Amino acid sequence: MKENNSRREFLSQSGKMVTAAALFGTSVPLAHAAVSGTIHCDANNTMKITDPHYYLDNVLLETGFDYENGVAVQTRTAHQTVEIQNGKIVALRENKQHPDATLPHYDAGGKLMLPTTRDMHIHLDKTFYGGPWRSLNRPAGTTIQDMIKLEQKMLPELQPYTQERAEKLIDLLQSKGTTIARSHCNIEPVSGLKNLQNLQAVLARRQAGFECEIVAFPQHGLLLSKSEPLMREAMQAGAHYVGGLDPTSVDGAMEKSLDTMFQIALDYDKGVDIHLHETTPAGVAAINYMVETVEKTP
């Protein structure tokens, strides 16, 4: 990069590279690369790198910053070779330097390498993605209770496609450089544990290149839908976090709802992941109550 390039120019250029380059994450099986530099990185040459140990040439790496008056004004970059072994970066080398001539080498085409990204709020178990296009149907004034009733009607229609669409959504995530996620999985009487079982089956198939935590999520209200027994079954079945939802506007009993959520977490030694959408004073009260509960719990 020229020393007089503006940061905006650099970011504009590198932004075009992120999508393809992020796929070089060490845990992702798909990468845009070419054997021995014969084909350069582009979206039409997607391939799998199956070699356990290899060199990746022409990788654009951020190496530092240029400063003006003590303020970083632009990023310095350089093309280098990355040595990867068993899914981990083991060395950075001068570009196209291969100390071990027996190892295969690939050409990254000058794309910017970035750390993998994480999606920490996604619902892999229920999505329209991968199915026919549908327009948003949420009239003005729709409440969360209205959405719960609508979802209770739609879930049986979505459930046969859970695995197929979760696979496609994971493909989309990986294509944008995301290899780690936390999926909130419906646990309520309509779905039972079926969504959890379907999601676990998909994640078992994708574990080589995709890591995902599962939140057992009482989407229809922990108390409102009487989901505590199912939540406990979900924790026994391997969910990683105990989910929670608006304890006042949905469950109608802030302290009881939060106490139940925390008790499940304590009983199974798991963390909590709660979605609190309440913008009324009830939301502040819920936050304060959770802080107090955490502080007094050993």
Locations of regions flagged by a protein language model:
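Histidine/acidic residue-rich metal-binding segments in metalloenzymes
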Residues: 194-208, 224-298
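Divalent metal-coordination and catalytic microenvironments
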Residues: 87, 110, 121, 177, ...
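N-terminal metal-binding scaffold of metallo-dependent hydrolase/deaminase domains
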Residues: 6-25, 30-100
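N-terminal-biased segments
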Residues: 114-132, 184-189, 214-222, 271-281, ...
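Active-site gating loops and adjacent loop-to-helix segments of metal-dependent hydrolytic enzymes
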Residues: 128-162, 238-241, 286-298
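Divalent metal-dependent hydrolysis catalytic cores, especially in the metallo-beta-lactamase
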Residues: 145, 149-156, 164-194, 199, ...
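An N-terminally biased module of ancient metal coordination in phosphate/nucleic-acid-related enzymes
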Residues: 11, 132, 170-171
